[in-house]
Regions:
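Non-catalytic, conserved peripheral segments adjacent to functional cores
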Residues: 1-109, 128-130, 140-202
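Conserved metal-binding segment of the jelly-roll/cupin
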Residues: 106-129, 135-138
Length: 202
């Protein structure tokens, strides 16, 4: 019943994929398969996922940019409620697109999924009042292996939609708001990450 649509190497970055599941709707509502291993393998994607995670965040929350160093994770992410702008940054040192980023809007309405291979930093910005975010990963969380990089590093130049503010030399959220005045909200840890030149490379 599957038949997913897969756009590969989005943004010209090898391995990044945007996936659209087949949605079967009628007067009652809809049904879709959010993950089908057989369909993924037929699309050339053979990944063994070991854990599912879910988070809820309010408008203006930015989580990221995160990765694990010795235990890198491939992630398959989607929004099940609300809208987020999801971003991946290539940190593979041997990649022709090292330091390049790609972003995609994920929402409960468009039902798109974003596949991010190992070797990337990942993060997202919540654009709706609330967003529930789900992701599958192919390795477990290792708290002592966490890494990250600044979400606003000018060398990367991520174009976060609806975000206003001026870079002041750090990952601090101070002075940044969305267009409607909602303050940008980051964890203390995410405001301390450094830029690309000082970030772990895979």
């Amino acid at each position: 019943m599957g038949q997913i649509k897969v756009e590969k190497n989005v943004g010209g970055i090898e391995g990044l994929c945007v996936i659209e599941p087949a949605v079967h709707g009628d007067a009652r509502g809809y049904f879709m398969e959010t993950y089908n291993e057989k369909d993924m393998k037929e699309a050339g994607i053979d990944i063994h996922f070991v854990q599912d995670n879910q988070s809820m965040s309010t408008k203006g929350v930015l989580r990221g940019l995160h990765f694990q160093k010795q235990y890198p994770q491939c992630k398959l992410v989607r929004a099940v409620c609300g809208t987020v702008f999801d971003v991946a940054v290539d940190l593979r040192s041997d990649s022709a697109t090292y330091g390049k980023w790609y972003g995609v809007a994920l929402s409960a309405e468009n039902k798109k999924q974003f596949l991010i291979p190992e070797g990337f930093a990942h993060g997202f910005l919540v654009l709706s009042d609330e967003a529930e975010f789900c992701y599958k990963v192919n390795d477990f969380w290792h708290p002592n292996d966490e890494g990250g990089m600044a979400w606003n590093d000018p060398e990367i130049g991520i174009e976060w939609p609806e975000l206003k503010g001026e870079y002041k030399g750090s990952a601090s959220a101070e002075g940044y708001t969305l267009e409607d005045g909602t303050a940008l909200n980051l964890s203390d840890k995410d405001q301390k990450w450094l830029g690309l030149k000082d970030t772990f490379k895979f």
